[in-house]
């Protein structure tokens, strides 16, 4: 069997794997949409602010607020648990009702509004409320945001678009605690 016959017999997805120039041709002239860059920069800023707080939160709770290690763990666990549970439902809700932008907006708004509460907190209960609110916001925005990235990006650029958004997110996580 000749190379051409193998290519003709291969499924379309495999042909792209055999011929990288096909992918390059599909991508020619395509750009990652501004929406992806905007979501990436918002993720960068949110991660910077979240990681600044997250790095110092245990010290704040243990020091001025007098929280025990167990209580600090409960606050962190409740926050992360709230994020994980919310992620499941936000993705399904976004798909079912089609309100991706609204859920992303609400998720970021909840995160932004919870940040000043940490600075104003004079009790572990207030820190708990802020942490759970912040993490619910993270859970709300994650899946719908990724769906928006897919919806606005041409399919040949999906990898690049997700890479850009995630790289900016990771840069924020790196810079935040510094």
For each predicted feature, which ranges?
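Glycine/proline-centered helix-kink
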Residues: 55, 173-178
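Residue-level signature of mid-helix packing/kink "hotspots" within the transmembrane helices
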Residues: 80-88, 173-174
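Helix-loop boundary and gating motifs at the non-cytosolic
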Residues: 26-80
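Helix-loop junctions at membrane interfaces in 12-TM secondary transporters
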Residues: 117-130
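Helix-to-loop junctions at the C-terminal end of transmembrane segments
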Residues: 86-98
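Structural signature of the two symmetry-related core transmembrane helices
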Residues: 102-116
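Cytoplasmic helix-loop-helix junction between adjacent transmembrane helices
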Residues: 130-171
């Amino acid at each position: 069997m000749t190379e051409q016959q193998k290519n003709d017999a291969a499924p379309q997805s495999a042909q792209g794997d055999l011929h990288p120039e096909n992918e390059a041709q599909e991508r020619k002239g395509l750009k990652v949409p501004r929406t992806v860059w905007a979501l990436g920069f918002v993720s960068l800023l949110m991660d910077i602010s979240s990681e600044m707080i997250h790095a110092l939160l245990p010290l704040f709770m243990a020091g001025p607020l007098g929280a025990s290690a167990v209580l600090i763990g409960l606050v962190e666990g409740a926050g992360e648990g709230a994020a994980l549970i919310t992620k499941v439902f936000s993705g399904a809700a976004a798909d079912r009702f089609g309100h991706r932008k609204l859920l992303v907006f609400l998720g970021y708004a909840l995160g932004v509004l919870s940040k000043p509460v940490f600075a104003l907190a004079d009790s572990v209960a207030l820190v708990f409320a802020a942490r759970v609110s912040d993490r619910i916001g993270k859970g709300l925005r994650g899946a719908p945001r990724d769906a928006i990235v897919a919806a606005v990006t041409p399919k040949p650029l999906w990898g690049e678009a997700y890479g850009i958004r995630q790289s900016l997110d990771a840069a924020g996580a790196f810079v935040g605690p510094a």
